[in-house]
Amino acid sequence: MGAGDKTAAGMPRIGMGTAVQGPKADPIRRAVLRAIQIGYRHFDTAAHYETEAPIGEAAAEAVRSGAVASRDELFITSKLWCSDAHRDRVVPALRQTLRNLQMEYVDLYLVHWPVSMKPGRFKAPFTAEDFVPFDMRAVWEAMEECHRLGLAKAIGVANFSCKKLETLLSFATIPPTVNQVEVNPVWQQRKLREFCRGKGIQLCAYSPLGAKGTHWGSDAVMDAGVLQEIAASRGKSVAQVCLRWVYEQGDCLIVKSFDEARMRENLDVDGWELTEEERRRIAEIPQRKINLGKRYVSEHGPYKSLEELWDGEI
């Protein structure tokens, strides 16, 4: 397993995430450039992360320096933010993303959440008045237009339940290529993975280590006793055990570290595999979702409960 290992659709199995608190352009640019030099080829961003511009600068610098022969060697994912999840705002939003990236296309464009907000609502905290009903069909038709225009080589979604995917597939003329969701040993997504596999949708795991250090993250993954025991017995880090487990499920994974040693470690999970006994022990870890998406729930909004947001799949 390495940064160059790809899915059947050509998506590198390991991507570098860039969702950081209070993003600062220069450290991100330097980290992305170093990641390219180390071997990463997939970079995950979003309009909401405000990291598109430094990724674009790093990509251009990598081409100039010869670290990659051309932009085509990189796989760039970005996402449509909720305030642009309206039929007439999707294509303009992607065009702005491309200006930020200084690129002619993204490899993958995702609907960030199955949520719509009033235009201009970008930063939390959000109020009940910010939310409007999510017109899935209208938004997806505009996503399909992004693909037809050549602005996005592939389109997909993030944070969609089985039920929402079923609805989307009932009318999509271009089905989603990817569903990017939280996946880790504490939230294993067995039902969703099986559903996606049956529909030809690639599952992509964010927060495979539990997103410790983020506003919603948890120590639950890295502190799990089972994972610590397996790591100690195999001479691996807990992170390597987690990433290997996600990889063995057939998922793509997004890892985030700007520390070079960790960047290298996150790529280096090849040449070994978990035993059947280790897989069984991981399968028995009590399950709980970490990223609940509480900020998108309001008693006066379209989603009045977490049950409604996730269609009971929590």
Curated annotation (Swiss-Prot):
It catalyses: 2'-deoxymugineate + NAD(+) = 3''-deamino-3''-oxonicotianamine + NADH + H(+); 2'-deoxymugineate + NADP(+) = 3''-deamino-3''-oxonicotianamine + NADPH + H(+). Its EC number is 1.1.1.285. One of its GO terms (biological process) is response to iron ion starvation. It is an enzyme of class 1 (oxidoreductase). Residues 1-22 are annotated as: Disordered. Pathway: Siderophore biosynthesis. SUPFAM superfamilies: NAD(P)-linked oxidoreductase. The keyword Oxidoreductase applies. GO terms for molecular function: 3''-deamino-3''-oxonicotianamine reductase activity; aldose reductase (NADPH) activity. CDD domains: AKR_AKR4A_4B (cd19124). One of its GO terms (cellular component) is cytosol. Mostly expressed in root tissues, observed in mesocotyl and embryonic roots, seedling roots, crown and seedling leafes, mature bracts, anthers, pistil, caryopsis and embryos. The record marks 79 as: Lowers pKa of active site Tyr. Keywords: Iron, NADP, Oxidoreductase. The active site is at residue 49. It holds the Pfam family Aldo_ket_red. InterPro entries: AKR, AKR4A/B, Aldo/ket_reductase_CS, NADP_OxRdtase_dom, NADP_OxRdtase_dom_sf. NADP(+) binds at residues 44, 158-159, 180, 258-266, 273-281. Signal peptide: none annotated. Substrate binds at residue 112. Catalyzes the reduction of a 3''-keto intermediate during the biosynthesis of 2'-deoxymugineic acid (DMA) from L-Met. Involved in the formation of phytosiderophores (MAs) belonging to the mugineic acid family and required to acquire iron. Belongs to the aldo/keto reductase family. This is Deoxymugineic acid synthase 1-B. It comes from Triticum aestivum (Wheat). The lineage of its organism: Eukaryota, Viridiplantae, Streptophyta, Embryophyta, Tracheophyta. The gene is DMAS1-B.
